[in-house]
Amino acid sequence: MVTVEEVRRAQRAEGPATVLAIGTATPANCVDQSTYPDYYFRITNSEHMTELKEKFKRMCDKSNIKRRYMHLTEEILKENPAMCEYMAPSLDARQDIVVVEVPRLGKEAAQKAIKEWGQPKSKITHLVFCTTSGVDMPGADYQLTKLLGLRPSVKRFMMYQQGCFAGGTVLRMAKDLAENNAGARVLVVCSEITAVTFRGPADTHLDSLVGQALFGDGAAAVIVGSDPVVGVERPLFQIVTAAQTLLPDSHGAIDGHLREVGLTFHLLKDVPGLISKNIEKSLKEAFDPLGISDWNSVFWIAHPGGPAILDQVEEKLGLKPEKLRSTRQVLSEYGNMSSACVLFILDEMRKSSAKEGMSTTGEGLDWGVLFGFGPGLTVETVVLHSVPLN
């Protein structure tokens, strides 16, 4: 007769959770940031709000974003005029879009990750799906399982309404699943569509306007597993530790509420200050056990909430400009895609490291940090170890 302890030991993997593949996807519709203010005020019938339009132009100019991708085209918005008003009942129309498009875009990213992984999708044992775009039952995890043709026995977990920190959350969860289930291969998908938050401008709520200047659509997928099969699976990053914390005195700094008018977004001005003031504590807790205290000696993947957050973090920690290069590159090319952002940055970093002939997937460095920031304020801190590049 076997003991519970023997069963438990047999269930555990030996090595650390490892990112084995990454895939990303965006809608076809690309929006140029320089012309977006004119388009946005025209499509929302707000061109008479000239002062507010000038403010919005300045927001877009300061965003450090060149382009974004959005499922919402002019044609779709003209068919759904309530979505173009500031506070018109429009949840049904938004839901009709996101319940279809969130899994569909997630499928596109997942297929790319599965192709890079090079293994049959029947080997996927777990699915973690995350979106802040709408809710449904059965969820986007179920829809994706059907779209991809995954096994009916795949163990699914659906995360709705988490916000921008959740790219770190899904890696933390994937780490626990992979390391506690020998042979597990976890498909992680973050898929975000701004159809749930798009709305016209209002001079009484500039925080909503900030969201309209920053947010874009995108989906990213990673496959995570422990003990990679040598010669068959190619490791990209090891997930070493993962932690979550609530920042002190930050209640109400970022929040969102699902209403008849869609998902409303609220942001306090001191968010960059709250994050930069507290970030070193999270870093020390993560890296003290490793004997690392030089923040320029690690590679950086930070959720790019907006340029002000990145600038203040950089200044507070004395980071060299190149430390946030991959982060700023993704912000520039895609905007803020909520939970998907950090996975896009992970992809950008491993690709640029290989392209530039660096010795590891982490810009030639061994250790790195992935940060997610979002409603709460919640901070996810994930310590990564890079993999040598041949």
From Swiss-Prot:
InterPro entries given in the database record: Chalcone/stilbene_synt_C (IPR012328), Chalcone/stilbene_synt_N (IPR001099), Chalcone/stilbene_synthase_AS (IPR018088), Polyketide_synthase_type-III (IPR011141), Thiolase-like (IPR016039)
Gene Ontology process terms (BP): flavonoid biosynthetic process; polyketide biosynthetic process
Catalytic activity: (E)-4-coumaroyl-CoA + 3 malonyl-CoA + 3 H(+) = 2',4,4',6'-tetrahydroxychalcone + 3 CO2 + 4 CoA
Pfam families: Chal_sti_synt_C (PF02797), Chal_sti_synt_N (PF00195)
Pathway(s) the chain acts in: Secondary metabolite biosynthesis; flavonoid biosynthesis
Taxonomic superkingdom: Eukaryota
Catalytic site positions: 164
Keyword entries, A-Z: Acyltransferase, Flavonoid biosynthesis, Transferase
Molecular-function GO term, any one: naringenin-chalcone synthase activity
UniProt key word Transferase: yes
E.C. designation(s): 2.3.1.74
Signal peptide range in chain numbering: none
Keyword Transferase set for record: yes
Entries under Gene3D superfamilies matching the protein: 3.40.47.10
Similarity annotation: Belongs to the thiolase-like superfamily. Chalcone/stilbene synthases family.
PANTHER family, sorted: CHALCONE SYNTHASE 1, HYDROXYMETHYLGLUTARYL-COA SYNTHASE
General function of this protein: The primary product of this enzyme is 4,2',4',6'-tetrahydroxychalcone (also termed naringenin-chalcone or chalcone) which can under specific conditions spontaneously isomerize into naringenin.
Listed name of the protein: Chalcone synthase
